Amino acid sequence: MTHRRIVPLPLTLRRLTVSSTERITPRMQRVRLGGPELGEFERDGLTLPALVCPGFDDHVKLIFASSGDVADVLPKQVEQGIEWRASDALETRDYTPVRLDVHGRELVLDFVVHTAGTGQESGPAAGIGEAWACAARPGDELWIVGPKSSTEKPDDVDWILLAGDETAQPAVERFLAERPVDVPARIVLAICDESARRDFDLGPDDEITWVLAAADDRETLAAAVADVAPLAGRPYVWAAAESRALLPIRKFASRRLGAAKSHTDITGYWHLTDVEQQAASDDQPQNAPTLPLVTSPVTWFAVRAALRSGLLEVVDIDHPLRLSLVEEAPLVDVLLACDVLVDRDGALWLTDTGEMLLVDEHVAEDFDGVAADQVLALVDLADALDTGRPAWQVRTGQTFAEAAVAHDDVRDELVDRSAGRVYLLPAITTLPVFSRERIGFCGPGAGVVAEGVGRTVEPLSGTYDAVVGADALASRTDHEVVAFLRDLRGATDEAVLIESTSPDGLGGDPTEHALVHLATVGCAPRDGSRVADLAAAADWVVTDTVSVGWGTTATTLRRDPKVS
């Protein structure tokens, strides 16, 4: 296996009941959950599948309400997925199951007790997940969703490195119990107190190293990982901890071990902004923590310039003297002020923030890349509103759709954004359109959808029984959408459009997204009625709409029989 493959799983809302609790160490609370909804069950006329959790690091999402009744924040269950509702009271936390026994109707979750010994295990200092677990009693209910997917791990490995802090222990325990790959393991675990040390079921060729590290210690875990003597052959590196503590481990995996991206899975389970806030973080993955460095437009442009000019790479490798960067001095001064760089005895070094910008593409894309270019188009929004053209077109001379054809980076970004459609495949693959013999595919998400239904993508040519468009409209202006749909009439009598038609409750600030969308294509994000209006303008009739989850709708169009 040369790459990691994501296996989508049906998203199902489940109500479980606490069967027992146990403090397995002073800093780890175990909760055993049961109930008929761990197996196949029925709700509201829907037959819903049993819980599956095939990967040792898969996670389920726990649902809480910060105020009021949890029933008011629960997502809506649809046939093959869920629809999150927007709610200020909605709180979710992700946890890795230690064990799942569907036949025995038992799910086991472990919760790190960050506040152990403080007397605040169930108080305001505890995160919402920790507080719930410490207060849980048999009979209490818990609502969960997921896993949304599982990542197949590579099998062409000779040894595995597992590293993390206390939040990684559930995944490590499950790996050792199930052994998805039968190879020697080197395990490095950081704990905040000796009381968190545990006995794991190690194999004869496994080795484990325990290190003491405070919550704000970003060096001890990485140093212990760097001390691991590499074994012969190809490694697989898995790590989970506080996001910034993982930065040197990312470098170690790629530079020292030579681990390919397909053989590296390093996830920030939480982000520490202040030592006292650790308890509130719980154990949820946060691959792209928000960086509090943009205090003005000037700092945004400074960070963008540092990324685009390669200055951060120069500092990371050479640690140049500050006085040697005469021409760059104003830029360096701003980067020092916003905590991207630090001056150590006259030499420049990256801070944790600078490291994050350099090694985490999800963080960097806020300042450089297509997403940042879309934000930059807002500079021309006022002029664009006067002309009736999108701000992107005013700024670049091309529409966004034209840019996607002309520039590989824009096209690749759209394909990357559509990659998330893989999580909706359990619903998408049930659409009646896929019973047709000859199907064409188009749009940035065409590859994901076609692969999910066992088809291939080819340039549209000739006629088809049906054409499926995956995110084919989102990057187009209204005028371009109508023209595209009119052209589609020459290829088929039936089209299915898979598009986002409402905000996803967990998808970030919808108001900011709507403004950037306006600047990019000249209109607000389209809802179902707007899609229908544009289809009608192109002489199509909407015959069916199906929610496939996450604010996404599959809209079936037929050629208007009144139009030749």
Residue ranges, per PLM feature:
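C-terminal alpha-helical "lid/dimerization" subdomain adjacent to the S-adenosyl-L-methionine
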Residues: 500-538
